[in-house]
Every structure is written in structure tokens, then in C-alpha cells.
């Protein structure tokens, strides 16, 4: 289970035609973010929505998650040295693999083609979606 991510899903369809993977922002969580699916949904899309929790709990916010830490030893990410930045880059790459593994599992379970899978994200989740 360490190589996939979990989170809530919403679907109005027994056999959805498309998959929307939703990646929340820094300090948020999948349970909050999944509610954006309801106003987005159009019946004709046949969409299954799933929001994934980032793998790390945010320091100082036990209900919030992060895709990567913005503060390394109290220093903002844009001000860290090359070694620390490389560590963050490696973590981002690991988390992209987890997202990809999860998408593969979901498309297989739902019998949805990868070309019918969409990824959206907000803030840090948008950065992760871009990395895919």
C-alpha cells in the first residue's frame, strides 16, 4: 500500500466512462477537496471523481497534508541549498510515481482507458498534476 495513495470518491454512474483525479493543495485534504466534484460534474461526462490525500501530514496541522515540505529546517524551499533542493525533487518524483501507480490501479479497476483519465490540482496539487 505504500506505493499508492488513498482518498474519497464520488460517482453517479455504475459504469463510469471517465476518471478525474483531484489533487488538493498544501495543508488541505482529500475529504475537503472531493466536494469540488459536485459542482463540476455533468451527467453526460460519465465521470468518476477521486481525490487523493498527499502522503505527508503537514507539520502543525494534523488535518492537513502536503505533497512536499515547503520549509526545510525552518528555511523556505526557495532559499535552501542545492542538496536540500535535490532531496525535495526526489520526494516529488516519488510522489509522482505514487500518483501514477494509483491512477493505473483506478483505471484498471474501473475499466477506463488512460486517455479518459484527467488530473486536476490546486496549489501544490496543481504543481503535482503538472509533474505528471
Regions found by a protein language model. Name each.
Residues 5-112:
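Serine-hydrolase catalytic machinery in alpha/beta-hydrolase-like enzymes
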Residues 35, 131-132:
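Active-site signature of alpha/beta-hydrolase-fold catalytic machinery across serine-
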Residues 112-122:
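Alpha/beta-hydrolase fold nucleophile elbow
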Residues 121-125, 129:
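Gly/Ala-rich beta-loop-alpha elbow adjacent to hydrolase catalytic centers
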